[in-house]
Amino acid sequence: MIQITVVQIDNYGPWTVTPNPRRESDLQALQSRLYCDMNLQFGAHRGLAFYTRFDNIIAITNGIDLETHKRIQNSVKNRYPFTVSMAVASAETAYEAQKLATETIQEYGSAQDDVRKEVLDVANEFVSNGYVQLAHVDINDITGKLTDLETAYDTYLSVQMTKLKLMEELKKYDSMGFFIGGDNFMCPCNGMSEKDFLCMFEDIRDSCGIDLKAGIGIGKTAEDASNLADIGLEVIREGKTDFQVYTLKQSIEERKDITYNYMCPI
């Protein structure tokens, strides 16, 4: 089981133009700061957040309880000119968990409803014995094939096209994909096998002409899984395996050493 939290800014669209449209550079900076905060605060509890659309953030929160969510929510209220609503859900796959969390928030009203404020709800249950599976995917030799040859924008366009195709393919497995900078993508993918990734990469290569590789990490928390995925990707980069997908799994002994419910540092 994987636990997902959907974070949504309350009534954000109307706020950006009240009483007049706010300066775009300020809005971009504010959105980026919120994303930074969410990663720092969930990250302090071994979680991981993805910016998606900035006014909606998706976080992997295995091991993070309701009280910690409330503390993070209060921290936003105390330091930002808006509030956020949160919904938590768990499921066998990442896509299904975010779907349940999204539906829970939607039950309280529209994202632009000035009455709906600081929702905090749980769709089903908190995960105690679940796991997180993350794939760290990147493009093979993007520097030699794109960065050093194409314009900055054309390279960016190729990366975004790859991202879209990757996200579409991952959804077929009830998984998700998020761009994390450079040519890198982090993909919550509980239930997927190495064979699934190899087949998916072949389809992407045939349609986009882009070769991908992935380190897969399986751990009790998002932090554990992402660390293992990073190591797996390095194994491929260093030529220590002939395959384009490499999986590392956290041992039971390592899982027992993890303590949850740290005090939020911010």
UniProtKB/Swiss-Prot annotation:
Query: What is the documented function of this protein?
Result: Catalyzes the formation of 2-amino-5-formylamino-6-ribofuranosylamino-4(3H)-pyrimidinone ribonucleotide monophosphate and inorganic phosphate from GTP. Also has an independent pyrophosphate phosphohydrolase activity.
Q: Which InterPro entries match?
A: GTP_CycHdrlase_3, Nucleotide_cyclase, Rev_trsase/Diguanyl_cyclase
Source taxonomy: Archaea, Methanobacteriati, Methanobacteriota, Methanomada group, Methanococci
Q: Which gene encodes it?
A: gch3
Keyword Cell cycle included in the entry's annotation:
no
Q: What class of enzyme is it?
A: hydrolase
Write down the EC number.
3.5.4.29
Q: Which UniProt keywords apply?
A: GTP-binding, Hydrolase, Nucleotide-binding
Record's catalysed reaction(s): GTP + 3 H2O = 2-amino-5-formylamino-6-(5-phospho-D-ribosylamino)pyrimidin-4(3H)-one + 2 phosphate + 2 H(+)
What's one Pfam family here? GCH_III
Q: Which family does it belong to?
A: Belongs to the archaeal-type GTP cyclohydrolase family.
Please list the GO biological process terms of this entry: biosynthetic process
What is the protein named? GTP cyclohydrolase III
Under the heading PANTHER family, the entry gives: GTP CYCLOHYDROLASE III
Q: What terms describe the molecular function in GO for this protein?
A: GTP binding; GTP cyclohydrolase IIa activity
